[in-house]
Curated annotation (Swiss-Prot):
PANTHER family assigned: PROTEIN PHTF2, PUTATIVE HOMEODOMAIN TRANSCRIPTION FACTOR PHTF
Keyword annotations of the record: Glycoprotein, Membrane, Transmembrane, Transmembrane helix
Polar residues composition bias: residue spans: 182-194
Stretches the record annotates as Disordered: 173-194, 227-251, 273-371
Gene behind the chain: PHTF2
Basic residues bias spans: 327-337
Membrane topology according to the record: Multi-pass membrane protein
Protein name: Protein PHTF2
Compositionally biased tracts (Low complexity): 346-358
PHTF domain boundaries: 6-153
Gene Ontology CC annotations of this record: endoplasmic reticulum; membrane
Amino acid sequence: MASKVTDARDWYQKKIGAYDQQIWEKSVEQREIKGLRNKPKKTGHVKPDLIDVDLVRGSAFAKAKPESPWTSLTRKGIVRVVFFPFFYRWWLQVTSRVIFFWLLVLYLLQVAAVVLFCTAQSPHNIPLTEVIGPIWLMLLLGTVHCQIVSTRTPKPPPSTGVKRRRKLRKAAHLEVHREGDGSSTTDNTQEGTVQSYGTSTSYSIGAVFRDIWHAAFFLSGSKKAKNSIDKSTETDNGYVSLEGKKTGKSSEECAQAQERLCEVIKPEESGWSTTTMRETFGTPSHHKETHRTVTNLSDEVSSEEGPETGYSLRRNVERTSSDGTLRNRKSHHYKKHYPLEDTPKSGTSCSSRCSSSRQDSESTRPESETEDVWEDLLHCAECHSSCTSETDVESPQMNPCVKKEYRDDPFHQSHLPWIHSLNPGLEKISAIVWEGNDCKKADMSVLEISGMIMNRVNSYIPGIGYQIFGNIISLILGLMPFVFRLSQAKDLEQLAAHSATELCITAFGSNGDILVLSMVVISFVVRVSLVWIFFFLLCVAERTYKQRLLFAKLFGHLTSARRARKSEVPHFRLKKVQNIKMWLSLRSYLKRRGPQRSVDVIVSSAFLLTISVVFICCAQLLHMHEIFLDCHYNWELVIWCISLTLFLLRFVTLGSETSKKYSNTSILLTEQINLYLKMEKKPNKKEELTLVNNVLKLATKLLKELDSPFRLYGLTMNPLLYNITQVVILSAVSGVISDLLGFNLKLWKIKS
């Protein structure tokens, strides 16, 4: 229905637009329709030695983004929390098995608490907010988690292995046909599979819990899917590279599949000539046989694994098909200077060697995110430099699977142009490093300098003060109902005269009713657990902000000899244009390093929750400030407001300090002074130093133009919505202060 309305709207727009057209506009439209079809074209290359404004701004280092809007993600998060058992597969894939069972127990306990509250007949002093409060917090946490994992949306596996193989084979053939037609590849086939699976499956309550038990204890696909999701990388153009660590079973099956594939395509002789290779790639029978072998092996492997693992293994087998065919190439083919007639017509060996080198390094090194990233970047930078001339010419008869692998490789899509433009032999700067008391010079690239900074940040031992503070607040909020009932029932002097049994009866709000006691205990457990989870997320965000500040501090120490030696980082001066370029690249990369959007979601949720709590408190104070503290939930709101405000102040302090470190133009001004000092000592280099000085001045102006002040909320807020929120909240605070102090006070001012 929506598509028909859209088509009708477009048709009517064109219809009424035709009445306004003149002759010149029609001729222009005819030329626009022709486009570039009749234009002569020749091969061109992007200048690798130039920089874009995206590089300085940081948007060149793309981060993962969700495909759905935040309203859809909020709705999905609420639905997945309310119907938690029915979405057990999704929760198993985006969390671990232990966390899933913990959340399931909390969900069942909360349901039991609501049922007990509704069925309790005896009079009790338990307010409704004590039972309903954890539900709102559970919905908030579920929504936040759904927005965090929205960039990695796993798809449930089909019901049977035969249907899975059939649909995977169909999807593979459709992808090949789309590749041959030159059209863009989408996930329509997979989406259709998921939709048909979701609509054709109906569960009873007993079947749901039986499937939960079976999935948690007897299926390993969710664990593998989680590993592949956690290790995947995605950019703005929708690329997903699943490089998760495989279990022993999947690794053995993949190795066997690779051995069988290599036996099929292995030549009878030890070496092939270039002519033989060209004939082999040009033979249609060999092309079809190889593709059929890859498809069969991928179907065989994926029939026993989960969807994400099967996808990874299929990509692995496809890499092996290209690598096994090309690996007997002689070493002189990779030299930069060779005759054109000896040049192979395929550019996939670079991608194959890059992928295999990354897999080999992943199997031997420890599990570290930093090492994984830098190994990938270093291997692919070397691979790119060795295969630059080889990838200039592409074969029109390339294997579609290999061409898809080559096209989907993120290291060949210029997502990191400043890395790929670096030649390891040329794009280096002379930096000073300290080994004890010895000062030595070394030629270092951007990757090596940033790697040393990251190692220094990772070696930093974070404090646990805010974690302890979160634990204390969780316990206080959990015990608040008991303390409030004791304070309302008895005076402090009378409490000492009562026995422990009477105090417990008063604190639990019942005279021994087992249903009420169970409800209070369950609410206490659920409340403490959910509040602890929320403050745990805030502690994770606080640590991330602290790491960003450390990145900024160490980056500022690079151009200071004393601070660089103290911080054990390299030291170099901005005395050349190349040094300035690498300094700007390093600055942008470090600003984008680490969690970005996920942490912004947590901080934004805390910010919006604080605004809501402050607004409710102000409304309660304006409505009934005489009896404000006589309500249990008002005490909880005050505690929430104080604790969240402390965390937000911490975020504001760290974020503002980080922005100040990166926007510190005193470094560039100091380097300009050093250039003038160098001009005085070396008049013969005055022209060169003047050029560098002018570039420094331009860099200073550019940073001032692009840098923006720190924002507490990570989500983009409409200016109108921001002004409305500011007016409502600050007006409420102004009203409270004016009512309590007795004079008018305005704290807000609308800004355009």
